[in-house]
Design a protein with these regions (language model features):
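Domain-level signal for Mg2+-assisted phosphodiester chemistry and nucleotide/NA-binding surfaces
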Residues: 1-92, 132
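Nuclease catalytic cores that cleave nucleic-acid phosphodiester bonds
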Residues: 57-165
Length: 165
């Protein structure tokens, strides 16, 4: 696949829930989304930065969403759905996949900030279309399928002091 160069058009797509849960469960810390974006872009031409977030009705959410926008992310917000049996779900996988496929003709690289193996098939498709695919996540919670499917991987655990607050 293509190498990294400054003229590459890049989109950074962040699965905020996926990263948040690992940062909290393993490190009891939060993600530094400014550093995440800077590392994802890596000196290339940023086309889009999208953070996919879940609204869970906690008081600090709105300020978090606003902070993401101030950094430069477009935020896509989904409410938690409560089902008849009382279970709750909130998932952005399909939305992220649709955005990546829609943006792909206008990009050279897609950076997926997630460790979710559900995106491995997307990676294969994007690579087939000539788009470089990179992932950024905590390796200890990243699926092998995703690691095998991407052109490049940044392990946030290796530089936790940079990527965690």
């Amino acid at each position: 696949m293509s190498t990294v160069h400054p003229a590459q058009r890049v989109a950074v797509l962040v699965d905020a829930q996926n990263l948040y849960h690992t940062a909290q469960s393993v490190y009891s810390r939060n993600i530094d989304y400014d550093e995440l974006l800077d590392a994802g872009v890596a000196g290339r031409e940023l086309t889009r930065a999208i953070a996919y977030v879940i609204r869970a009705d906690s008081p600090e959410e709105e300020s978090f969403f606003e902070a993401l926008e101030n950094i430069g992310y477009e935020t896509k917000i989904k409410d938690i759905k409560t089902h008849a049996d009382g279970s709750k779900t909130a998932d952005w996988d399909v939305g992220m996949i649709l955005d990546a496929v829609t943006l792909a003709p206008h990009l050279d690289t897609v950076v997926l900030c997630t460790g979710d193996g559900d995106f491995s098939r997307l990676c294969s498709h994007l690579r087939h279309e000539g788009v470089r695919v990179e992932a950024m996540a905590f390796e200890e919670s990243t699926s092998e399928e995703l690691l095998d499917a991407v052109d490049g991987f940044t392990d946030l655990s290796e530089r936790a002091e940079r990527f965690l607050l």
